[in-house]
Amino acid sequence: MIMDNKQFADFCADLESGRIRVAEKIDGNWKVNAWIKEAILEGFKLGTLTDMSEGQFPFIDKDTIPVRKFTVEDKVRIVPGGSSVRRGAYLAPSVIMMPPAYVNIGAYVDEGSMIDSHALVGSCAQIGKNVHIAAAAQIGGVLEPVGAMPVIIEDGVFIGGNCGIYEGVLVREGAVLGSGVIINKSTAVYDAVHGDYIRPDETGRIVIPAGAVVVAGSRPIRKGPGAEAGIHVYTPVIVKYRDGKTDASVELEDLLR
């Protein structure tokens, strides 16, 4: 893909308006628009290093991908204190960012969602409506390979503090992830409700089911010196499924207590 600076600027404007996005849900299935990732990578190649310093704070980055500027008309709340949104990221009206937080290029954050302090929404991550990303949670970026599915958090999900969701993991609607839950494509997630491990789907990614309530857990090593020493390895555990009657944070608090 070959672009000039004006074409790339127009492309970023389309991303920022929500007219185009890296992944979209079609007939219940998520589809990657690989050409958008290709264009983002082209933008990095186009750019030259430039001084973006502000006052006493030194910043140097590619001139094609500066910090995105917002106006009151965008209806996005970015509370003062060190947050940053990169060019080419979409934040819908009514999104709230608490400082400091960061949203990278290609990310899509839908209406009513909150990004709390010290949280990251990585490149191309797709965040649904009314999602709560709690303090220090990390939603990983997936820019390469271009055909790889980004991390996707569907509507109404609660991501607890210090969670880490990486490598194209899909979290379905209404799920609740307790503080400290870490999931990537090779993480063994145990479903204690159904008595089995969640297996990667046909694309190789882990899918957390809709309404699942997930907490950090462990499982024992079964053989070798680790077993003899009583060592356990980290394993997220689905402890129940939400029934839709209880607020996510209250339900999680009750389970943990």
Show where each model-derived region lies.
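Terminal amphipathic alpha-helical/low-complexity segments used for targeting or macromolecular assembly
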Residues: 1-76, 205-206, 210-212, 216-257
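Structural signal for interior beta-strand "rungs" in well-ordered beta-sheet cores
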Residues: 72, 77-222, 226, 238
